[in-house]
Structure formats: structure tokens, C-alpha cells
Curated annotation (Swiss-Prot):
InterPro entries listed in its UniProt record: Ribosomal_bL36, Ribosomal_bL36_sp, Ribosomal_L36_bact
Annotated protein name in UniProt: Large ribosomal subunit protein bL36
Superkingdom of source: Bacteria
Keywords (A to Z) from UniProt: Ribonucleoprotein, Ribosomal protein
Keyword check for Ribonucleoprotein: yes
Family per similarity comment: Belongs to the bacterial ribosomal protein bL36 family.
The keyword Repeat is assigned to this record: no
GO molecular function: structural constituent of ribosome
One BP term from GO: translation
Pfam family, one: Ribosomal_L36
Gene: rpmJ
GO cellular component: ribonucleoprotein complex; ribosome
SUPFAM superfamilies, per the entry: Ribosomal protein L36
Source organism phylogeny: Bacteria, Pseudomonadati, Pseudomonadota, Alphaproteobacteria, Rickettsiales
């Protein structure tokens, strides 16, 4: 999982990318391509 300061470019990498909020953190999940996973934060 990549940790990024901004997820805007990550969100547009694939059409299956979804933005989810879990426990106060923002995640990008992709069930089709799991290597697209990312979390926002430093």
C-alpha cells in the first residue's frame, strides 16, 4: 500500500478505484487491481 499526501492522481489511475473513509483515514481500494491501493497521510 502506498502512502500519499494527495490521492487525487491516484483516484484516476483506474476506473475501479474507490475512495473510502475508515477510522478517520482516507483510502483508495481496488478489488480488480489490488496494487492500486493507497492511503492518505504522511
Amino acid at each position: 500500500m502506498k502512502v500519499k499526501g494527495s490521492l487525487k492522481s491516484h483516484r484516476n489511475r483506474d476506473k475501479n478505484c474507490k475512495v473510502v473513509k475508515r477510522g478517520g483515514k482516507i483510502y483508495i481500494i481496488n478489488k480488480v487491481k489490488p496494487r492500486c491501493k493507497a492511503r492518505q497521510g504522511s
